[in-house]
């Protein structure tokens, strides 16, 4: 083998150097010398190799080595030896590491081998194993070991039968055998048995090695000790066939059983069927020679055999021979009948046996008509093996005689119904069979005897029938009668009869038929027969059933009509009728009269004058004209006419309709004016007038005499009358005239010359109001916001003093004369109108004091308070003390142009 690799040599050198160093240290310490072997204990797979390191701490040993019986090689040093043991096969070996250092130093090791369970053998099973008997399972695992680490398991399929561990066996022991005795069962049939071996070396740091044997299949069987049941005849006739059967119960598996059936030296071909654990074989047995033969049945299973045997006697027994002296004999001729059979058979002719077995039997007689077609029978019996066998023969005699026409075969009188096909038969007795011919005595029609054909009245009459053969002829007269049903035609019995009310009439029908019929008529669904003259009244009109009765009875329906003039009945044509719009209902006016009168109703006055009233048809159909949408109410005159007269009736027609709510009566979007009279959000058409209820969010609208802004919203309105209801969703909007809700001045105190001030006017109105301003003439630099609600003045001057009028306008009115007066630095006046100079001078001192002392800080104006007060109002809405002086000036006269008294506000302009 090759030496150690360079890497291994380096490793060994390192260990040697390390060991020498340790030895030096030991020598210095004067420790005892020793020898060491690594590894001391090892487990190696059989045939493998192992490196051993033998070393000592002796500084200079005289000699050393590794003693073992195994092949080895490897490097060495002064104080160490490295050896590779190869092809280790012995179960156990003990190598010795030794060195000579004044004394002999030794170290012993232990090397053991293991072998995997590569071969697991299950001893072959018997080809068939009887159920209920024991068989042996034996498993061998040669060479595997150590045995103490082995475990063997015997298995049936995946089921463990027995498991054995060999723990505690000697370490050198190898291989193992496990044997078990098992009782064979039916369910073991076809089962696979196997052996599993486990070598567990995990405690030694190795793995678990497993292997299993090839499975061996077991075939079990059960065969009863009883013999098969054989069913077969005791005797069998030559060249005849007979069924034989063989049955055996208690087989397992029955499908594996074999059956052998044979008669003598001839093997039969059985048909085998299985019935649970029973096998049944049936076959057809036949033999060609007389004698005693053995019938054998054998059943084999699992190498065992059960059989049964029976003796069968094969015989020959011909049928008896029956002869007639003349098979066809003339009437009155002597006839001899003879019956013969085999030598051992006893014959019997017509119940009379022969004198002895093997003797013939005879019968003689004179042939007569009654013997024609007579059959003669002969029986032959044979006693064989305790059984009585019998056979018979027969012969028929034909007797020749002249024709005979009997009433049974050819009646003198025939009666047939007309119409259905019949087969006309007139048969004669005779041998040979006679030919029969039937024709009228006057040489007319000939009957087609024996053929299927229709029966007509023309066939009725008397015929002469002749039957003839070689023995003679016979003649007979026959009469044919053809019956037919009564005929009720339109001449003798018309289908429709018309009588006039008040006259005399009778209902009679004449019918023809064979045999002659009788005729009677009754009213439909009544029992009384109509006879004699009748005084015609309307109640006689209707349908009558006339019956003509003979053997082929016939019935016919006759409709009798009684005519009379028109007449109106209140129940079928009412005097008062109400038409409901949309009901698709027409006026029904049914008039009594025959023929059916025509009816027409025409308006006589008012809106319906000259108009035709549509009438409901008597027999409605899809093609009838459509129902009119509008029908004029009023008085109509109905006239009914037929050929016998006319009748007149007056009908009052009124029209009603279900509720209807649409944009014409109840717009879905409505606009109301605040303060107007409240009429409700909805109305509806209909007759009678519908009742309308409206609710908003489920609550009914409160009753208010005048429209309020709170009435705005969406309503569900339902209109109802006797003919139905209608609903509609209505959205209500409320509009109102402008009201100035806010007037504000900023700043709220005085304005110095050159300062800025702003006037704001806000109005409430729907639709929204348009705002406009009127400023003092010549006031410069006035600015307005986009919607005119704010007026601003930058750099106020004396020219900005005066009236500023805010006007709010929409379609329902306007609010105006909201006035602000800007006073100059020396004049402090705030009054409701443009008063004269004298009045202003007189009131100046008091007003200046009012302006200076009033808390006008908020800069807001409450229009509603101002409209209800005659006082001058401050910008924050507080009342002033101008009193009546403001009401009596010229400005008060101008107030007639506006809906409310003008309000005046003062903004003080002070010097800079």
Swiss-Prot record:
Residues 30-826 are extracellular. Disulfide bonds join 54-97, 58-101, 139-195, 246-297, 339-378, 410-465, 493-546, 573-638, 666-717, 761-806. The modification Phosphothreonine is found at residues 179, 181. Glycosylation at Asn-53 is critical for functional folding. It is found in: Membrane. Keywords: Cell adhesion, Disulfide bond, Glycoprotein, Immunoglobulin domain, Membrane, Phosphoprotein, Repeat, Signal, Transmembrane, Transmembrane helix. It holds the Pfam family ICAM1_3_5_D2. It is a single-pass type I membrane protein. Expressed on neurons in the most rostral segment of the mammalian brain, the telencephalon. The keyword Aminoacyl-tRNA synthetase does not apply. The chain crosses the membrane at residues 827-847. Glycans are attached at residues 53, 134, 192, 211, 311, 366, 392, 576, 639, 756, 787-788. GO terms for molecular function: integrin binding. GO terms for biological process: cell-cell adhesion. Residues 678-708, 880-902 are annotated as: Disordered. InterPro entries: ICAM, ICAM1_3_5_D2, ICAM_N, ICAM_VCAM, ICAM_VCAM_N, Ig-like_dom, Ig-like_dom_sf, Ig-like_fold. It comes from the Eukaryota. One of its GO terms (cellular component) is plasma membrane. Residues 848-912 are cytoplasmic. Residues 47-127, 132-232, 239-324, 332-395, 403-481, 486-561, 566-645, 659-734, 738-819 form the Ig-like C2-type domain. Residues 1-29 form the signal peptide. Its main location: membrane. ICAM proteins are ligands for the leukocyte adhesion protein LFA-1 (integrin alpha-L/beta-2). Belongs to the immunoglobulin superfamily. ICAM family. This is Intercellular adhesion molecule 5. It comes from Oryctolagus cuniculus.
